[in-house]
Amino acid sequence: MTYQAINFHQKFGLFREQWQPKVIAEMNDYQFKVVRLQGDFIWHEHKDTDETFIVLDGVLRIDFRDGAVQLAAGEMFVVPKGVEHKPCAEHEVKLLLIEPRGVRNTGEQESERTALNDVWI
């Protein structure tokens, strides 16, 4: 077995596209995904799972139907399952997402922002 640290900076250097999560590791049935984003996402929910957002660089706002939370680099937030939300960022943000394998980024919604799942880098 090879033991090697995963470097976020190096992983972000491998892609430029936004709103396309890339898997960098797995733990049990959970995937760790890096993603770049800027602008508004779509309103969506994940009915069967929570979703964790960890901001590595930039500022992210997650809108909810009854409020919002703003996250800066070094902060995280767990969106509870079944809660409709919409991530957005004025400037590019780099995130680490933690969610179960197979979770689609747009939940059950279909849009131009729906990304391929299980894309590894």
Can you describe what each PLM-predicted range is?
Residues 23-28, 43-46, 54:
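Short secondary-structure boundary/capping segments within folded domains
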Residues 81-111:
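Ligand-binding loop in jelly-roll beta-barrel domains
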Residues 65-81:
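Short acidic-glycine-tyrosine-enriched beta hairpin
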Residues 28, 56-57, 72-73, 91:
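A cytosolic small-molecule/anion-sensing beta-strand core signal
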Residues 17-18, 31-47:
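Conserved short histidine dyad/triad with adjacent acidic residue
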Residues 1-33, 110-120:
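A short, N-terminal "cap"/entry segment at the start of jelly-roll beta-barrel domains
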Residues 31, 40, 59-61, 68, ...:
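Structural motif
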Residues 36-37, 46-63, 98:
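Short, conserved beta-strand element in jelly-roll/cupin
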